[in-house]
Design a protein with these regions (language model features):
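N-terminal segment of the mature soluble domain
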Residues: 49-141, 171-191, 195-197
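Generic short beta-strand segments
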Residues: 40-42, 138-144
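N-terminal post-signal-peptidase region of extra-cytosolic proteins
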Residues: 20-21, 56, 115-122, 149-156
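Sec-dependent signal peptide recognition
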Residues: 2-9
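C-terminal motif of bacterial Sec signal peptides marking the signal peptidase cleavage site
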Residues: 12-15
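Acidic/histidine-rich, surface-exposed loop or edge segments in extracytoplasmic proteins
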Residues: 38-58, 102, 221-227
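C-terminal/domain-edge helix-coil "capping" segments
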Residues: 17-36, 45, 144-147, 158-165, ...
Length: 275
């Protein structure tokens, strides 16, 4: 009975994560032993609802450059794959070559942008780099209901806010998405707006205005670093937090009963088989 209770707890914890597997985890492990990681992509077709949209797209492209190395590092540290390989390429060329279309999933607070991929383009990349699947991370603009607090944590304003959200997927050579990260509520990567509680307070106004964060403020947020162990403090905080979350979710053998340890992924024999 105690064993069954522990199993139920672990299953419930698995359902609380931001990402989810669209096939059984055992099947995922068998199909994706070597994972390819693309540069961070930016969806410039999704409106940011910000007056400086063009400058923000440029800022994201500039700050994203090379950051996928940190994600590869996080994934390798988890030891959930036989190998994790970086895939080179120009981010915008990759986006327009790979992405066949997008649609909105969920609703309200859980809405997110879902992407479909061109199977031939995916196959060319997986064959060329000898990987079983691609991890595609797309930064995109989305407006959805969020609850934002003032600095005292005593007041909040729930409204529609624009933000940079993250949609991620593991795609097989056939174009099938077998793992998805749907940007869960409260996980916005970079808020683009804020409620001005101070203005309302000093003007003795009941209405709280929603204002746009400046490009300079967004750049500071993307570049913010904190002290840390093992040299991690030199990395931008927002990116490190995102990659740690993604790597933690992308472990097909994460949820083990106490006393059990996950087996190391078996190396592929000969050339890697594809589904």
């Amino acid at each position: 009975m105690r064993r069954m209770s522990l199993l139920l707890i672990f299953v419930l914890l698995a359902g609380c994560g931001g990402g989810y597997f669209k096939v059984p985890k055992e099947e995922y492990q068998a199909r994706v032993r070597t994972l390819g990681v693309l540069p961070l992509l930016v969806d410039e077709r999704a409106s940011l609802r910000h007056p400086d949209e063009g400058l923000i797209f440029e800022l994201l492209q500039r700050e994203n450059a090379g950051k996928e190395e940190l994600l590869v590092e996080e994934l390798r540290a988890q030891k959930a794959y036989f190998d994790v390989r970086r895939i080179d390429g120009h981010p915008q060329d990759l986006f327009y070559g790979l992405v066949r279309g997008s649609s909105l999933g969920g609703q309200g607070k859980t809405s997110y942008r879902r992407y479909a991929f061109d199977a031939e383009a995916v196959r060319n990349l997986t064959d060329g780099h000898v990987v079983d699947g691609l991890l595609v991370v797309v930064l995109n603009g989305l407006q959805r209901p969020e609850k934002r607090w003032d600095r005292t944590r005593l007041k909040y304003l729930e409204a529609d806010y624009s933000a940079i959200q993250v949609s991620a997927a593991v795609v097989t050579p056939t174009g099938e998405v077998i793992w998805e990260y749907p940007s869960p509520p409260g996980s916005e990567f970079l808020p683009l707006q804020y409620p001005d509680f101070d203005e309302a307070h000093y003007n003795m106004a009941e209405a709280v205005a929603i204002k746009d964060i400046s490009v300079k403020g967004l750049r500071r947020a993307l570049q913010e670093r904190t002290g840390g162990l093992l040299g991690k403090g030199k990395d931008p905080l927002l990116y490190r937090k995102l990659f740690s979350d993604l790597a933690g979710q992308l472990q097909p053998a994460t949820f083990q009963l106490p006393g059990k340890t996950a087996a190391e992924p078996a190396p592929p024999t000969g050339s890697q088989a594809r589904p």
